[in-house]
């Protein structure tokens, strides 16, 4: 069986090289084009779906909607969950990645962005960026909403949701598309491929390019494939990798 993952298109804050996390930032014009292109590619390659999953954040929701529009599938059922939200970047949210690297060092920023079990500095309870103050989460228990997360923390919410909800749909024969975020999808990739914490450190997921997983009947990993020109995909991955490095003017 197949599972298709789609990282949202470039957001306004991706474009400005800012830490985004749970901040509800919309797609840039480039991101909208990437999302539409993903839908065109999926349609051309003959992919179809029975149910889609996404987060509570508009950049992922809009990416999914734009892709489905190109596929003539806007009527498909869509399940939204904060469990698929981006990793929460704590106090780093809104900061420029290059400027943060210049201040704290590239290695520290790489650890914050790509390490397995080290969280960035947490938000204070009274911070206006605390999810408890956001309308999307008004039905959620405040104590389960994060103030900052490591990738390990992100995995702790993504993987149970995948196993308890998404995988059940797949095992029932449903074709699934997940439109989410760089780190929530990396969390899932680590689980699906049984990667070590060291290996996941160097995984970079490009925006707006469908990633297809082939799984066996028990949901175990067989193979994966990006749907796109190999050189284009490589360039997009390198662009993501370059974020968080000091920019020399």
From Swiss-Prot:
CDD domains noted in UniProt: HP_PGM_like
Residue sites binding substrate per the record: 7-14, 20-21, 59, 86-89, 97, 113-114, 182-183
Transmembrane segments: none
Protein keywords: Gluconeogenesis, Glycolysis, Isomerase
Catalytic reactions on record: (2R)-2-phosphoglycerate = (2R)-3-phosphoglycerate
Positions bearing the site annotation: Transition state stabilizer: 181
Residues of the active site: 8, 86
Class in the EC hierarchy, top level: isomerase
Enzyme Commission code(s) on record: 5.4.2.11
Superkingdom, taxonomy of origin: Bacteria
Biological process terms in GO annotation: gluconeogenesis; glycolytic process
Pathway: Carbohydrate degradation; glycolysis; pyruvate from D-glyceraldehyde 3-phosphate: step 3/5
A GO molecular function held by the record: phosphoglycerate mutase activity
Family: Belongs to the phosphoglycerate mutase family. BPG-dependent PGAM subfamily.
Protein purpose: Catalyzes the interconversion of 2-phosphoglycerate and 3-phosphoglycerate.
Protein name, per record: 2,3-bisphosphoglycerate-dependent phosphoglycerate mutase
